[in-house]
C-alpha cells in the first residue's frame, strides 16, 4: 500500500503548479486502478491549507473546491485511512532526534513515522524524505 504526500496532491490539483498534468495523470491512474492506497487526515488537511493560502497561490483555491477534491480521494472505495498507532510517537521522536528535525521538518518526521509504522510506501515529490532512516519512499515518477 502507498501513502501519498501533500505535495503530490497539490501538484495534481493546481493547474498552475509545476508539472501539474503529469501529477494529475499519475493521481488519476492511481484512483482508476485496482490498487489500494492510503491517505492520512493530516495530509488532506495540509492540502486544503496550502491550496487555499493566499500567500502561496494567487488566486488561492476556494475552501469548497479544495474540500471537494479531498473528499473525492478520502471517500474513494480503495482509500484506506491511515492514522497513528501505538508505535507512532516513539518512531516520530526517534526520527526527530536522528535528523535534528526542527521547524518545518517536524511535520515531515511525523508523516515519515506514520508511513513507517503503517508499513506503507511514502509517495512524495520531496526527496528530502531520504533523511528518515527506515522510511520506504519514492517519487511518483520513479
How would you name each of these model-derived features?
Residues 8, 43, 87-88, 110-111, ...:
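Alpha-helix capping/helix-boundary segments
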Residues 1, 112-142:
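Acidic, PIN/NYN-like endoribonuclease modules and their adjacent C-terminal/linker elements
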Residues 1-39, 54-68:
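Short, well-structured N-terminal submotif of metal-dependent ribonuclease cores
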Residues 18, 32-35, 56, 75-79, ...:
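Generic structural signal for secondary-structure transition and capping sites
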Residues 38-41, 82, 124-125:
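Short beta-strand segments at enzyme active-site cores
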Residues 60, 78-123:
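Active-site neighborhoods of divalent-metal-dependent phosphate/nucleic-acid chemistry enzymes
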Residues 54-57, 99-100, 139-142:
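Short, hinge-like loop/turn segments at secondary-structure boundaries
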Amino acid at each position: 500500500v502507498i501513502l501519498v504526500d501533500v505535495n503530490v496532491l497539490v501538484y495534481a490539483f493546481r493547474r498552475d503548479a509545476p508539472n501539474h498534468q503529469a501529477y494529475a495523470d499519475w493521481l488519476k491512474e492511481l484512483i482508476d486502478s485496482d490498487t489500494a492506497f492510503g491517505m492520512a487526515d493530516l495530509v488532506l488537511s495540509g492540502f486544503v491549507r496550502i491550496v487555499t493560502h493566499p500567500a502561496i497561490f494567487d488566486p488561492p483555491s476556494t475552501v469548497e473546491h479544495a474540500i471537494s477534491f479531498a473528499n473525492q480521494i478520502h471517500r474513494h472505495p480503495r482509500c484506506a485511512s491511515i492514522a497513528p498507532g501505538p508505535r507512532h510517537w516513539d518512531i516520530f521522536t526517534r526520527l526527530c532526534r536522528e535528523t535534528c528535525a526542527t521547524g518545518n521538518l517536524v511535520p515531515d518526521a511525523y508523516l515519515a513515522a506514520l508511513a513507517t509504522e503503517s508499513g506503507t510506501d511514502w509517495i512524495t515529490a520531496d526527496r528530502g524524505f531520504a533523511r528518515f532512516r527506515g522510511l520506504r519512499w519514492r517519487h511518483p515518477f520513479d
